[in-house]
Structures are given as structure tokens and as C-alpha cells.
């Protein structure tokens, strides 16, 4: 479970649904009936906070000036998670859109991996005056991985702004060894 609190601004205002002071956490949870302790509840067994103490994220974050550099909903909009065979996690998010690589303790291992040529209005990589190529909140929504962990397949929630078919949802292939997109899409 990826936890992030969501808020919405007043009707008609721009909506950025991630709260700036809400730390992002990964939680390992189980249903109580699966644990043999009764039905109808979810029990959190373990959780870790996502953080960047090594400074891998190359742009300013909400807690830029703290030692732990906890990540919040203002930094990334996490939507998908793939557990890698080595115990690390790959996370798809919407703002960049980016794929993040984090250790099992929540520490960011590498710089966020941007999809080349694609930027949302919320992307920290969007230069002043640059036109976004992806509508807001249409970044990586779903993601899966190959059984051996070599490739990830993040899926854009929406079509690129210039795509004539706005129903199109593109699956991209990311090589986890090189941390580069292969150019293969579906």
C-alpha cells in the first residue's frame, strides 16, 4: 500500500491532489482473516518512509534542507509499485512522469528516470515557457515488471497532448539494468 493523503482545492481551482506535508510511506499490510485473527480489518505489519538522504533527486523537494529529506505528496504523485527480485522497489509516478528506484528501507537509490520527451505541467523538468507534452495527472498510473526483473512496463494514464487518438494508453519498456527506455512501446 502506498499511502498519501489527498485533498482537493475549492471548486474551479487547479487541483494538485497531494498534500505537501504528508510523508510518503510504503506499507506492508494483511487482511486480518488471512492472519487468522478475525475478518474485516487491515493490519499494517511494517512501513517505511520514502526519503532521499543521499540527494539522488536532482530538483528541490519539500524537505530539501533536512538530513533525511523525507518525500511528500508535493514531490511525487506515486501511483504504482513493482517489487524487484533483489528486494528493492520500482515506483511509477505522475508528476514527471518518473520511475523511482528505492531500497526496501525507503531510501531513493538513483535519480528519478524521466520518460524522454514527455513532461506534465507539474514536472520539475518543465522549463519556463515550455509547453507540457502530457496533460496533468496523466503520468505513470500502472506498471508491471518482467518475471526476471530486467524490464519494467509503466503505462501512461492518458494520451500525449498531441496524440490524435486521446483514448490511446501507451505501455513503455524500461531496462532496469541500464535505467533507460528501450524504445519499445505497445
What annotation goes with each model-predicted range?
Residues 1-186:
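Sequence/structural signature of beta-propeller domains
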